[in-house]
């Protein structure tokens, strides 16, 4: 018989740098999960992606065991990394922070394709372009 799910916890944690401190500790502690076991396993799985923020979906079962799925980093994080900027524009319609090429958009869209709700790579590219525009990043035609 399948285990009964007690909770699903969604977090965004820096790759390879999970600690029992907030936000991880309190989110898992309230469900009685062994926090150190999660931290160790998450850091081992994401060590190769250092510097990126990784969304993780933790499924907690009634017997306090857990499983988790790591997803691809958010599009905004990938765009900031591609452009080498720290923060996006506070006023995206007035102040632009950089330009991104269609090739870079395609690369990011291909990387995120499995997590996006898009039927084609073109649709995924349009989603990434929308994220870029909302961050104050110009998309080269």
From Swiss-Prot:
One of its GO terms (biological process) is translation. Belongs to the universal ribosomal protein uL11 family. SMART domains: RL11 (SM00649). Forms part of the ribosomal stalk which helps the ribosome interact with GTP-bound translation factors. Keywords: Methylation, Ribonucleoprotein, Ribosomal protein, RNA-binding, rRNA-binding. Part of the ribosomal stalk of the 50S ribosomal subunit. Interacts with L10 and the large rRNA to form the base of the stalk. L10 forms an elongated spine to which L12 dimers bind in a sequential fashion forming a multimeric L10(L12)X complex. One or more lysine residues are methylated. This is Large ribosomal subunit protein uL11. Gene3D superfamilies: Ribosomal protein L11, C-terminal domain (1.10.10.250), Ribosomal protein L11/L12, N-terminal domain (3.30.1550.10). SUPFAM superfamilies: Ribosomal L11/L12e N-terminal domain (SSF54747), Ribosomal protein L11, C-terminal domain (SSF46906). GO terms for molecular function: large ribosomal subunit rRNA binding; structural constituent of ribosome. It comes from the Bacteria. One of its GO terms (cellular component) is cytosolic large ribosomal subunit. It comes from Moorella thermoacetica (strain ATCC 39073 / JCM 9320).
